[in-house]
Amino acid sequence: MNEVEQLVIKNLLLDEEYVRKAMPFIKSEYFADTTGKKLFDILSKYFTEYSAIPTKEALVIEVGQIKDISDDQHHEIVKAIGNIDTEKSEFEWILDTTEKWCKERALYLALMSSIKIAEGNDEQRAAGAIPLSLIHI
């Protein structure tokens, strides 16, 4: 995970107000690697189910329940959880940073999708779908 992704995950684990304001705009696919995606999925599912932020211990237990990851990925996710520090970020700054990151990732993913469509590598969408993918950013 890059630094911004680490900050997003950290604040989702530490700051309930941040979770309530930011989580609706964050998507799993915005994270560049499996570690970030899986951690976000666990945090999101936990918060939706319990309306509370999980402890690090709960996260580790939830990671153990994931079936579609390798042992190496499991180890990386558990290691990332252990590396999360407990210092909250300044609230307005982390919200602004998260908003900017979400916009950048949405644009990047839309552009990558458009390239795939343009090259004929998307079996589900034709070239006419390119403008639609960029409109929905």
Annotate the PLM regions:
Residues 135-137:
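Conserved small/polar residues in nucleotide/adenosyl-binding loops
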Residues 1-101:
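Noncatalytic partner-interaction/assembly domains of nucleic-acid and motor enzyme complexes
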Residues 43, 105-128:
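A short N-terminal interaction module
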